[in-house]
Structures are given as structure tokens and as C-alpha cells.
A protein has these predicted regions:
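PRPP-associated nucleotide enzymes
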Residues: 1-143, 147-211
């Protein structure tokens, strides 16, 4: 486990005009950890021990980016996307719906189903959403904490398509741009707004953000 060296002074974060993207990049540098390979661990503030005031600012920025799209529901996948998706849904004043990775006893009736590959865990997950919560009148904003190769996002798009719902776009906290999933989906016409985009990452060289 290798901690990323914090190279930015706190006073820089406080300067007037610092954007949400810059605040997030600074936080990643300060508190993120690069694990072997392509894993960026940000569980100290984003997806395990959640810094609610900070993540809420990210959610407000995602709301600003999509405020004119008529969003009726926010869609994510369990579990690490739930926090940012919930706060984004709160900003919109709409429900948040998350796809489950297994059918539990409290889900009854018909479901939409797709498959998402987890590169972190090296396995395929069948994800499901109850049909009673997603329909053709919905305008969906997909929210997730990470975008890498695009498997989870593609699975959520598939579920929305099965439901006949309109996807207005996707809001991502951290995109690993170098893994190509985001650009591939953009080429297919999906609007994706990422608050931080990583150009390259390694334990030796640290993180380089896209500019």
C-alpha cells in the first residue's frame, strides 16, 4: 500500500475560484492510496468512510451540470455508488434507485437484469432492478463513484434500455480516462460528466490528471 504524497498546500484549496474539480483532485492527492495495479483507494472520504459535507458539494456540482435535463430518477449500482447517488438525488429532489447484485427475498415480481464485470474483484455480477421502479416515463441520470472500462455503466444503460427509460447522461466522480471506457461510451452518444479525470496512475509516478 503506497500513500500518495500530499503536494498541495491547504491554502491553495481555499483560494477563491478553486473549482469542484480542483478540490476533488486535491483530496485525491491528499487522502487517496494507490494499490498494486490500477486500484485507487479513496475509501477514507468517498465510498466507505464518507465525508458527507465534501461529497455533498460534489453532488451539488453534478446537479448543476444536469439541472436542465428534467431528471426524474437517479440510478446507480450497489454499493460504493450509493452515497454520491443519494446526495445527487437529494439535490434534484427525486428518488434514487440502485441496482442490486443479487436477488434478495425482499425483491418480488419481475426484474430487469444485466451483467457487469468487476475488474477490482475479477468476477461478473448479475445486477437487477425491480420493474415496478423503472419505466418508460423516466428520465434517468446514472451516477457512480468510478468509471474505468465502463462495464458497470454499460450494464445500467442496458437496464434503462430494457425499461424504455431515457438516459440523459452519467455523472462520475472519478474517471480513469486511460482505461478507455468513458471515451468508448461517449463515442456511442452518451453524455458523461466526470468531476476528476485521471490520465495516468502508478505507484511509482503517482497520479496525473487530464487537463
Amino acid at each position: 500500500m503506497i500513500s500518495i504524497v500530499f503536494v498541495l498546500h491547504f491554502c491553495e484549496i481555499c483560494k477563491k475560484g478553486v473549482t469542484h474539480m480542483q478540490l476533488l483532485e486535491n483530496r485525491i492527492i491528499k487522502d487517496g492510496q494507490i494499490l498494486g495495479g490500477d486500484i485507487l483507494k479513496v475509501d477514507s472520504f468517498l465510498n466507505h468512510n464518507i465525508d458527507i459535507p465534501f461529497v455533498n458539494k460534489l453532488a451539488e456540482e453534478l446537479h448543476r451540470l444536469y439541472s436542465d435535463c428534467g431528471v426524474t430518477k437517479v440510478l446507480t449500482i450497489e454499493a460504493s455508488g450509493i452515497a454520491i447517488a443519494s446526495l445527487t438525488a437529494l439535490s434534484f429532489g427525486v428518488p434514487m434507485l440502485f441496482a442490486k447484485k443479487s436477488k434478495s427475498s425482499n425483491i418480488t415480481g419481475d426484474v430487469f437484469c444485466s451483467t457487469a464485470h468487476s475488474y477490482t474483484h475479477g468476477c461478473d455480477n448479475n445486477i437487477i432492478v425491480s420493474k415496478k421502479f423503472l419505466g418508460k416515463d423516466d428520465k434517468i441520470l446514472i451516477i457512480d463513484d468510478f468509471l474505468a472500462k465502463g462495464s458497470a455503466l454499460s450494464a445500467l444503460l442496458d437496464i434503462a434500455k430494457q425499461a424504455g427509460a431515457e438516459v440523459v447522461g452519467a455523472g462520475i466522480v472519478i474517471e480513469k480516462e486511460y482505461q478507455g471506457g468513458g471515451n468508448l461510451l461517449r463515442e456511442k452518444g452518451l453524455r458523461i460528466e466526470s468531476l476528476a479525470k485521471i490520465k495516468s496512475m502508478s505507484a511509482e509516478g503517482g497520479i496525473e490528471f487530464c487537463r
